[in-house]
């Protein structure tokens, strides 16, 4: 019976045996494939790619890296696809790579036809693909069994040094403004190591998920625009990290059931890592926050913050197939009960810092899908507020927004650490936002019948700008000191514009 027919009929308790018997490649087969591919690597390292003119006048191969399943140690027995990333000396920036990528591909393609060692291996089907990024793809055959191997070669700019990448490397990547994933090969070593150094048991789970995906999704829907295997790998790693707290000993059936359940909830997924890039850098922070506000599912490449590897694919088809998998023997125990899954949140918890003028900051761990009401309950228990809690937030470059109790942080697109403003009001007080010239806004509590001067005094106390130097404006009307707010039709959570009335006024005090 074909392997593709056996997973669904295999008992959940024996999935370890299934992986060992059907998915784990033999050492002899793997060595034969890698020995054949080594001929390609030697050609790339030793060939002189000089041209009389153009970007390839002096091209040296700095490094050849095996990536994909052969690189990270999760290859399936049936896999005959090998991916190589070639770092070249002629690329000195992401912009140069984008400009000369096609020319270098054509040069390598032309030189391959003159390599006798590759011709002896049956080099054929040599072409340049239009994928992102574009690459050189061809087939060769192993020396002993003459099994056909498909090799993909991607030239790349070597952006990384021997140590961890600096924030400036990622800032330059973001500023290069390439198509998402176009420069990911420059970070392929980080992508490979993200999986390569994981426990053996996790690699077994990765093989199991990839086998399921290949046999029961891709082969059944060959024309559909399905997610890349890399997205499934990252989702599986996240499930293991969150579900077992990175325990090397776990049950494969529980891991498989967990991944299938996550795939069913693909519209809620928002997953990212900050191992290689930090949100402390403003350019990186803006990029990541923008990505996390996108349409879900979101699975950010841990090595490339510009690349949501889950974007634009038919996840609905994958979800349907995952639902079918959960009904099979591989997801049922010996008592004919569904295998329990791990408790894995669809987005990781984030740190929320609650700030209130005149009080110490409060810090809470909150899940983006929890109702805001729960956060307010935590604040209430922490501080014992008597009034009405008014929470608001402001993204860089955006307007301050009121956060409503029945909503979630996810509703506002908040999926990473954030600061929230707290204002405690007592009825009939209302909240107004005062927007400074620099774009930042602050929340103030006012009584609708208070004079405008009362708000100006609060602004002076907090920001240091004297009342006589302030001009407040609402809907095109300048607010006069001795008029009340009700007379201007000012209601709860509206924004009032603050500006200076005289030259040389004291600067705003950062808050």
From Swiss-Prot:
Principal location class: nucleus
Pfam families: OAS1_C (PF10421), ubiquitin (PF00240)
Gene3D superfamilies: 2'-5'-oligoadenylate synthetase 1, domain 2, Beta Polymerase, domain 2, Phosphatidylinositol 3-kinase Catalytic Subunit, Chain A, domain 1
Compartments where located: Nucleus, Nucleolus; Cytoplasm
Name of the protein this chain belongs to: 2'-5'-oligoadenylate synthase-like protein 1
Domain of life: Eukaryota
The entry's keywords: Antiviral defense, Cytoplasm, Immunity, Innate immunity, Nucleus, Repeat, RNA-binding
All copies of domain Ubiquitin-like, residue ranges: 350-429, 430-506
Function of the molecule: Does not have 2'-5'-OAS activity, but can bind double-stranded RNA. Displays antiviral activity via an alternative antiviral pathway independent of RNase L.
Keyword Cytoplasm among UniProt keywords: yes
Induction statement: By type I interferon (IFN) and viruses.
GO CC annotation, single: cytosol
Single GO MF descriptor: DNA binding
Family: Belongs to the 2-5A synthase family.
One GO biological process term: response to virus
Subunit (UniProt): Specifically interacts with the ligand binding domain of the thyroid receptor (TR). TRIP14 does not require the presence of thyroid hormone for its interaction. Binds MBD1.
């Amino acid at each position: 019976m074909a392997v593709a027919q056996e997973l669904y009929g295999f008992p959940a308790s024996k999935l370890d045996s299934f992986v060992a018997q059907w998915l784990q490649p033999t050492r002899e087969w793997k060595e034969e494939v890698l020995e054949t591919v080594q001929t390609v690597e030697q050609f790339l390292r030793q060939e002189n790619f000089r041209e009389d003119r153009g970007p390839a006048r002096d091209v040296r191969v700095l490094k050849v890296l095996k990536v994909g399943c052969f690189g990270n140690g999760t290859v399936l027995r049936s896999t005959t696809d090998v991916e190589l990333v070639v770092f070249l000396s002629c690329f000195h920036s992401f912009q140069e790579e984008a400009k000369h990528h096609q020319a270098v591909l054509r040069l390598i393609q032309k030189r391959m036809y003159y390599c006798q060692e590759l011709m002896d291996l049956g080099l054929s089907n040599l072409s340049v693909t239009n994928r992102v990024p574009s690459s050189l793809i061809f087939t060769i055959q192993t020396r002993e069994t003459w099994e056909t191997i498909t090799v993909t070669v991607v030239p790349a700019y070597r952006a990384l040094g021997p140590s961890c990448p600096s924030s400036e490397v990622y800032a330059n990547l973001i500023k290069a403004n390439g198509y998402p994933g176009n420069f990911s090969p420059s970070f392929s070593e980080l992508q490979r190591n993200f999986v390569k150094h994981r426990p053996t048991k996790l690699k077994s789970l990765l093989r199991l998920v990839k086998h399921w995906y290949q046999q029961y999704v891709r082969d059944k829907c060959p024309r559909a625009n399905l997610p890349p295997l890399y997205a499934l790998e990252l989702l599986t790693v996240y499930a293991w990290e969150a579900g077992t707290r990175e325990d090397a000993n776990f049950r494969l059936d529980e891991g498989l059931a967990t991944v299938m359940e996550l795939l069913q909830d693909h519209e809620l997924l928002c997953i990212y890592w900050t191992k290689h890039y930090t949100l402390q850098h403003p350019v990186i922070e803006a990029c990541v926050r923008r990505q996390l506000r996108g349409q879900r599912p979101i699975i950010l490449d841990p090595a490339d913050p510009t690349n949501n590897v889950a974007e634009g694919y038919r996840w609905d088809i994958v979800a349907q197939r995952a639902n079918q998998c959960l009904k099979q023997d591989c997801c049922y125990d010996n008592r004919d009960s569904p295998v329990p899954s791990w408790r894995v949140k669809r987005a990781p918890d984030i740190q929320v810092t609650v700030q209130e003028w005149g009080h110490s900051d409060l810090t809470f761990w909150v899940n983006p899908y929890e109702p805001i009401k729960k956060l307010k309950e935590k604040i209430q228990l922490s501080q014992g507020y008597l009034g009405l809690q008014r929470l608001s937030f402001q993204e860089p470059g955006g307007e301050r927004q009121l956060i409503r109790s029945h909503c979630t942080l996810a509703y506002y697109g908040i999926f990473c650490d954030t600061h929230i403003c707290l204002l405690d009001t007592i009825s009939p007080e209302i909240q107004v936002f005062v927007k400074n010239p620099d774009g930042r806004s602050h929340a103030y509590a006012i009584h609708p019948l208070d004079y405008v001067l009362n708000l100006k005094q609060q602004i002076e106390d907090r920001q240091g700008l004297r009342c006589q130097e302030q001009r407040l404006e609402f809907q095109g009307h300048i607010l006069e000191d001795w008029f009340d707010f009700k007379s201007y039709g000012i209601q709860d959570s509206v924004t009032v514009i603050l500006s200076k009335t005289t030259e040389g006024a004291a600067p705003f005090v950062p808050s």
